[in-house]
Amino acid sequence: TYGKLAISKTGQMLMGWDSEKREFIYADRSLKGAEFEIYADGDIVTQDNQGDTWFKGGEKVATITTGEKAEFTSDCKGICNYSVDENDVVHITLPLGKYKVKEVKTLYGYVFSKDNEWNLEFTWENGQDEFVLNSTEDTDKSGSLNLRNELARPQISLLKEDADTKETVSGAAFSLCTAQDIYNVDGEKIVEA
């Protein structure tokens, strides 16, 4: 019996430009390249009651790169394994025990979340199950850690003052222009400079 976990990472990506509304169009997509580390939260021991230890408490177990791969510090005789599906979800298997998952790197242009650590626990239920899912509240019912990064969005505040009186002038109109062409996530030019 082993623990089974899926990690997915999404965020808004620039898709297009609505010229009538004069606003950018965004959609959620999977984010490839966010990095997570998994640490043993206490000793992770073999299930044969022989006292062999797979990982010591606090030891790094794996580095996960969303949409790409997982690198384990030990394969635990084939228990530690991974696959990546067509939606860029990384599926991993781990020995039973308690773990901490930490996001250590997000993609350029995305806000690194303050909530970047999650607890996992895979506990033995019976000898019939091939795998068990996380028993903490940090994953959904299917054992998936579904995470989202917010796109960093600049905010601009403009205030027009009278040059002589320094009083605020209401109703002033401003234009915001781009010095470079703007492209969407697929590399298509959507706004010309």
Where are these regions (language model features)?
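Solvent-exposed loop/turn and edge beta-strand elements of beta-rich ligand-binding domains
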Residues: T1-A193
